[in-house]
Amino acid sequence: MNITQTFYDNMASKYDKLFQDWQATTQEQAEILDRLFREYGYNHTAHILDCACGIGTQAIGLAALGYAVTASDISDRELAEARERAAQNGVQIRFAHADFCALSDAFAEQFDIVIAMDNALPHMLTAQTLSTAVKSIVGRLKADGIFVASIRDYDSLLTNRPPYSPPY
C-alpha cells in the first residue's frame, strides 16, 4: 500500500467533513459538470468514468442526473464509503478498485468522459508519474472523448485565506 492509499483509507470515514454540506455539494458539482459536458455535446447517454471517485462526490451526483457512471479509486475504504453512499442515494454505479495510473488493468472499455476531480492529479509527484497517469486516462477515452480534472489554486487560498473553499 502506498502513502496515497493509506492517506485516503484513513480519511474515508471523515472525507465528507471537508464539505460544508456534502449532499448539497454532490448535486452542485453534478450540475456544474453537466453544463460542461453539454457544452462539449454530451448528454445523459454518455458513459463516464470517475477514475478518482473517493467517497463518490461527483459519481453519485452524476448518476442522480441519469448518467451511466463507473467509478474507481485506489482506496478500498473510500470505495466502500462510496458504495454505501450510492445505495443511500438510490443510484446505480459500477465500482472498481483501480489506480488511475493503470486503468487498463481494471477496464477494457473506453468511456465518453473521464473525470479526476478534487485535486487527484497533484498526487502525481513527478513528471514521470503524471505522464503515466495522463496516458492511462487518455487510454480509456473514446477517440472523441473528453477528460475533466480539477486542481485547487493553493496560492490563492494561502493569499486570501477564505473561511471555506468549495472543492472545485
Language model regions located:
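A short glycine-rich, Lys/Arg-flanked "PGG" loop and its adjoining helix->strand segment in the class I
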Residues: S131-A143
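Conserved class I S-adenosyl-L-methionine
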Residues: M1-A52, I146-Y168
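A short SAM/SAH-binding and catalytic strip from SAM-dependent methyltransferases
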Residues: D112-Q128
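Class I SAM-dependent methyltransferase SAM/SAH-binding core
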Residues: L49, T57-L103
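A short acidic, Gly/Pro-enriched loop at the edge of an enzyme's catalytic core
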Residues: D105-I113
